[in-house]
Amino acid sequence: MTCYDEFEYLLKITKVKNQSTMSLPAVEPAVAAARRRISSLNSHLCSSSSLSSTSSSSLSTRIFVSDEVQIALRNNIPVVALESTIISHGMSYPENCKCAMEVEDIISSKGCVPATIAIIDGYVKVGLTRKEIDKLGKEGARGDVQKVSRRDIAPILANASLSESSLGRLKLGATTVSATLLIADMMKIPVFVTGGIGGVHRNAETTFDISSDLIELSRAKNTVVVCAGVKSILDIGKR
C-alpha cells in the first residue's frame, strides 16, 4: 500500500464519520481539498526519484568524463570502471602506476574502454590520462591523496570549490569501491572491476563497522561489480 492509498483510506473513514454530523455538500469540498493536499504530499513522501535526480544533477556539474569514455558510452562500446585507491593507497610508487596502466591495457586489448575514476583538480574524473594516473600514484606515495568513500565525495568537492575561490591547493581524491560504484552507476557504466571489496569487520556486533561498499552494492541499478570477494581481513563468516 502506497502513502496515497493509506491517506485515501483514512479519508474514506473520515468521510463516513462526518456524514452523520455534516451534510454531503459540505463534506465533498473538504474531501476534494484534502485529496489535492495528499496528492502533493504523496509526490514528496512516496517517491525518492525527485530527490535522487536533484542530488545527481548537482553532482553531475562536478563530473568530467573523458572524450574516449563519452564516445564509448554513446556508441555502446563496452566500458569498464576502475577504482583509484589501489593506485594511491595499495602499492608503492612506481609499481602502483605500472599496475594500473597494465590493467587498463588489458581492458583495451579486449576491445573495451577503461574508465579509472578519481577526484582531480576539484572534479570527479571518469577516465584518467596516463599523466593523471602517475600524479595520483606519486602523490599517494607521499600521503597527499585523500581516500574518498561515498560519504566523502560532497565534502571534498565542496572544499575544492572553496579552494578555487581562494586560490588554494586542490586536494586529490582516490575513490573507494563505494564511491567508484556510485559514479559508475550514475554514468551507466555496465561493469566495474576491482580486487577485494569491503564487508563486515570483526567485532561488528559492538563496533557496527560495516563497509559502505555493501550498502552501495544494494543501491546500484546500472552497474555490476566483478571482484575477488571481500578482503581477507574482514569477518568473512558475516559477509
Locate the predicted segments by residue:
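Glycine-rich nucleotide/cofactor/substrate-binding loop typically near the N-terminus or early
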Residues: 71, 84, 89-91, 96-162
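Short coil/turn connectors at secondary-structure junctions
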Residues: 74-78, 82, 109-114, 151-153, ...
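N-terminal basic/disordered segments at the start of proteins
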Residues: 60-73
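Internal active-site segments that recognize and position negatively charged phosphoryl groups
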Residues: 173-200, 229-239
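Generic N-terminal amphipathic, Lys/Arg-enriched alpha-helix
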Residues: 40-41, 78-90
